[in-house]
């Protein structure tokens, strides 16, 4: 059993031309748990305006430690971990999204569930780290500690009116982050993390909010992202810069 104590703090703030939310989450395995781990997570989300352009940023930082981690509770490189997916009505079971889209391989896939470090361009990728002799040192698709910066620049105002009027939004995005499965100490923190991974591209969202007689259903967003650039692309890709695409439900952050 993955028994755990969760303590969550949230602080909202405003400043000139923007606003933000800071979340601090402490999670620790508790009495009766089959696991032994704890983690503290900081997430700062900011919304800024520059004339007609909207800029969103998300700064994420997590430090975790423990001798036995629940796999579903680990930090994910690309998006939500298994625990977060179970909390979503769209991903907890086969239906709108097939569970095959949650598998990991030596290449990326075409579905992104927001969460974790949120490096959306690496969805479904095992993210291997290599030794100097070319052998695989680790798979960094998940870990226990990590940091990331996610950015979206919304330029919907400059789209043709017919698109804006049909609830279509567009943005440029970039994500970058590092991750590790090692317990962080004063001695190893400089070398414990993986090399930086980053992605960038363009995305579009469409909001569904007209369900006729089913008026109690909350609106939800269908997202189409094209992460053209990966700085550490899979060996199966032809280049760092190429056509890639993925579908997501709800905004990335």
Annotate each language-model stretch with its function:
Residues 49-53, 209-216:
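Secondary-structure transition/capping motifs at alpha-helix termini
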Residues 135-143, 184-196, 236:
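Short, contiguous acidic/charged loop-to-helix segments that flank catalytic cores in large enzymes
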Residues 68, 177-199, 206-209:
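Outer-membrane beta-barrel transmembrane domain signature
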Residues 201-202, 241-253:
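Outer-membrane beta-barrel "beta-signal"
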Residues 159-169, 180-184, 212-217:
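Extended hydrophobic-aromatic, low-complexity segments
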Residues 2-163, 180-182, 248-252:
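C-terminal outer-membrane beta-barrel translocator/porin domains of Gram-negative envelope proteins
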């Amino acid at each position: 059993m993955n028994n755990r104590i969760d303590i969550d703090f949230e602080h909202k703030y405003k400043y000139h031309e923007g606003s933000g939310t800071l979340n601090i989450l402490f999670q620790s395995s508790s009495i009766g748990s089959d696991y032994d781990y704890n983690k503290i997570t900081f997430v700062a989300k900011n919304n800024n305006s520059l004339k007609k352009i909207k800029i969103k940023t998300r700064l994420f930082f997590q430090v975790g430690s423990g001798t036995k981690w629940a796999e579903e509770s680990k930090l994910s490189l690309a998006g939500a971990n298994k625990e977060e997916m179970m909390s979503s009505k769209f991903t907890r079971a086969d239906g709108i999204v097939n569970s095959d889209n949650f598998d990991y391989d030596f290449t990326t896939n075409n579905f992104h569930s927001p969460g974790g470090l949120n490096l959306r361009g690496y969805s479904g990728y095992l993210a291997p780290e290599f030794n100097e002799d070319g052998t695989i040192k680790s798979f960094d698709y998940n870990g226990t500690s990590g940091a990331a910066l996610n950015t979206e620049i919304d330029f919907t105002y400059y789209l043709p009116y017919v698109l804006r009027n049909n609830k279509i939004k567009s943005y440029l995005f970039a994500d970058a982050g590092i991750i590790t499965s090692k317990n962080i100490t004063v001695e190893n923190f400089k070398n414990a993390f993986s090399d930086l991974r980053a992605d960038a591209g363009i995305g579009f969202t469409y909001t569904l909010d007209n369900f006729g007689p089913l008026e109690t259903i909350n609106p939800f967003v269908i997202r189409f992202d094209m992460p053209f650039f990966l700085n550490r692309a899979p060996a199966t890709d032809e280049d760092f810069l190429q056509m890639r695409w993925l579908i997501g439900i709800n905004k990335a952050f």
